[in-house]
Amino acid sequence: MATQTAEESSRARPKKTGLGGLLKPLNSEYGKVAPGWGTTPLMGLAMALFAVFLSIILEIYNSSVLLDGISMN
């Protein structure tokens, strides 16, 4: 018969794909935490630089920074 019960279909193994095989190593370290601070200082530096970038963009948008030789309408 071509029909399956719910029990039989729940036992089916997931289909393996090429993309899944490539991504599996990325998920193998799930839940593990490296000891120490790791790359936290680098992330803090990146966040600080991004905050500076955003503040510069905001100041230019608000025309609170005088730009020599550039006329803004």
From Swiss-Prot:
**Which NCBIfam families does the protein's record reference?**
PRK02624.1
Which GO terms are recorded in the biological process aspect for this UniProt protein? photosynthesis; protein stabilization
Q: How does it assemble?
A: PSII is composed of 1 copy each of membrane proteins PsbA, PsbB, PsbC, PsbD, PsbE, PsbF, PsbH, PsbI, PsbJ, PsbK, PsbL, PsbM, PsbT, PsbX, PsbY, PsbZ, Psb30/Ycf12, at least 3 peripheral proteins of the oxygen-evolving complex and a large number of cofactors. It forms dimeric complexes.
Which HAMAP family does this chain map to? PSII_PsbH
Question: One GO CC annotation, please?
Answer: chloroplast thylakoid membrane
Q: List the disulfide bonds.
A: none
Task: State its role.
Answer: One of the components of the core complex of photosystem II (PSII), required for its stability and/or assembly. PSII is a light-driven water:plastoquinone oxidoreductase that uses light energy to abstract electrons from H(2)O, generating O(2) and a proton gradient subsequently used for ATP formation. It consists of a core antenna complex that captures photons, and an electron transfer chain that converts photonic excitation into a charge separation.
Regarding how it is modified after translation, the entry says:
Phosphorylation is a light-dependent reaction catalyzed by a membrane-bound kinase; phosphorylation occurs on Thr residue(s) in the N-terminus of the protein.
What is an example of a Pfam family matching this protein?
PsbH
The answer to whether keyword Thylakoid applies is yes
Q: What name does this protein carry?
A: Photosystem II reaction center protein H
Q: Where in the cell is it found?
A: Plastid, Chloroplast thylakoid membrane
What terms describe the molecular function in GO for this protein? Answer: phosphate ion binding
Q: Which InterPro entries match?
A: PSII_PsbH, PSII_PsbH_sf
Q: How does it sit in the membrane?
A: Single-pass membrane protein
Q: Which residues carry this modification: Phosphothreonine?
A: 3, 5
Disordered: annotated span: 1-20
**Family, per the entry?**
Belongs to the PsbH family.
Q: Does the keyword field hold Transmembrane?
A: yes
Membrane-crossing residue ranges in chain numbering: 41-61
Keywords in alphabetical order, please.
Answer: Chloroplast, Membrane, Phosphoprotein, Photosynthesis, Photosystem II, Plastid, Thylakoid, Transmembrane, Transmembrane helix
